[in-house]
C-alpha cells in the first residue's frame, strides 16, 4: 500500500457511562507535518463513534460509503451493525487486492434486553477492524504505534475499573495518553479531539491543545541560543 497523507494513533476505552476516544488532528506526508485540523473521529448513527488512523483519503471514502449505505436503508443500525459493515467493507477491499489503509475503532451503546421486555440495559461495545478486515473486541483499544506506546499505560489505569471511571477522569486519561504520544511519536501533535458516547448521545469536542513540557529534553550544561 502507498501512503500519502496519514493520521496516527487513536486511543479508546470503556468508562462508567459509555465509550471515549481521542486522536490528534495532524495529517502527515511521510515525516512532514503537512496538515492540521484533520478530523479523525466521526459520528455515525445516533449511538456510534468511529476513530480512524491511516490514510486520510481512505477515511473520507469509508465515511462516504457508510453514509450512502445507511441512506439506502432506513432501519436503525447499532454499533455492532456498523462494526460488521466496516469489517465487510475492509475485507472486501482486501480480497480485491486493493486494501484500504485504515485501522478503525468502533464504539457505542447497544440497546440490550436482559430478558424482561420492561427492563432494558445499555451494552458498551468497543472493537477494532484493521486494513485486512481482521477484528477484535476489548475494553481498551489503541491503533497504530499507540498499541506499543500507550496501550500498556491505559490497560494499567482502566482495566478492572471501567465502572468506576467518571467522564472527567476518562478525558484526563485520554489527554495523558495523547501527551505521551506527542513526546514519543514524531507524527503526533498536541492538538487533539476527544469524543465520547453515553446515554445522551454522541459528543465530539472541537480541536484543542494539551499542555506539554519539553524541559525533560534539556541538559543542565546545555547552551540554548535564544
Swiss-Prot record:
Coiled coil: none
This protein's UniProt keywords: Cytoplasm, Nucleus, Proteasome
Top-rank taxon: Eukaryota
Record bears the keyword Nuclease: no
Chief localization: cytoplasm
Regions crossing the membrane: none
Single biological process term from Gene Ontology: proteolysis involved in protein catabolic process
Location(s), subcellular: Cytoplasm; Nucleus
Entry-linked Pfam families: Proteasome
GO cellular component: cytoplasm; nucleus; proteasome core complex, beta-subunit complex
UniProt keyword annotation of Signal present: no
UniProt-listed InterPro entries: Ntn_hydrolases_N, Proteasome_beta4, Proteasome_bsu_CS, Proteasome_sua/b, Proteasome_suB-type
Family according to the record: Belongs to the peptidase T1B family.
Function summary: Non-catalytic component of the proteasome which degrades poly-ubiquitinated proteins in the cytoplasm and in the nucleus. It is essential for the regulated turnover of proteins and for the removal of misfolded proteins. The proteasome is a multicatalytic proteinase complex that is characterized by its ability to cleave peptides with Arg, Phe, Tyr, Leu, and Glu adjacent to the leaving group at neutral or slightly basic pH. It has an ATP-dependent proteolytic activity.
Description of how the protein assembles with itself and partners: The 26S proteasome consists of a 20S proteasome core and two 19S regulatory subunits. The 20S proteasome core is composed of 28 subunits that are arranged in four stacked rings, resulting in a barrel-shaped structure. The two end rings are each formed by seven alpha subunits, and the two central rings are each formed by seven beta subunits. The catalytic chamber with the active sites is on the inside of the barrel.
Name of this chain's protein: Probable proteasome subunit beta type-7
Organism name: Encephalitozoon cuniculi (strain GB-M1)
Amino acid at each position: 500500500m502507498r501512503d500519502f497523507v496519514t493520521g496516527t494513533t487513536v486511543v479508546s476505552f470503556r468508562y462508567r457511562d459509555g465509550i471515549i476516544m481521542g486522536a490528534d488532528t495532524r495529517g502527515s506526508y511521510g515525516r512532514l507535518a503537512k496538515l492540521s485540523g484533520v478530523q479523525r473521529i466521526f459520528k455515525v448513527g445516533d449511538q456510534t463513534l468511529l476513530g480512524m488512523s491511516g490514510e486520510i483519503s481512505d477515511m473520507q471514502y469509508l465515511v462516504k460509503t457508510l453514509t450512502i449505505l445507511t441512506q439506502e436503508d432506513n432501519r436503525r443500525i447499532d454499533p455492532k451493525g456498523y462494526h460488521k459493515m466496516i469489517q465487510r467493507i475492509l475485507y472486501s477491499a482486501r480480497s480485491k487486492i486493493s486494501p484500504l489503509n485504515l485501522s478503525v475503532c468502533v464504539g457505542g451503546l447497544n440497546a440490550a434486553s436482559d430478558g424482561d421486555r420492561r427492563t432494558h440495559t445499555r451494552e458498551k461495545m468497543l472493537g477494532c477492524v484493521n486494513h485486512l478486515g481482521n477484528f477484535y473486541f476489548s475494553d481498551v483499544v489503541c491503533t497504530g504505534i499507540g498499541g506499543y506506546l500507550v496501550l500498556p499505560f491505559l490497560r494499567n489505569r482502566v482495566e478492572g475499573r471501567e465502572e468506576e471511571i467518571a467522564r472527567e477522569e476518562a478525558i484526563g486519561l485520554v489527554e495523558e495518553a495523547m501527551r505521551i504520544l506527542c513526546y514519543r511519536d514524531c507524527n503526533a501533535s498536541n492538538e487533539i479531539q476527544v469524543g465520547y458516547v453515553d446515554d445522551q448521545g454522541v459528543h465530539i469536542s472541537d480541536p484543542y491543545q494539551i499542555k506539554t513540557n519539553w524541559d525533560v529534553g534539556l541538559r543542565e550544561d546545555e547552551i540554548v541560543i535564544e
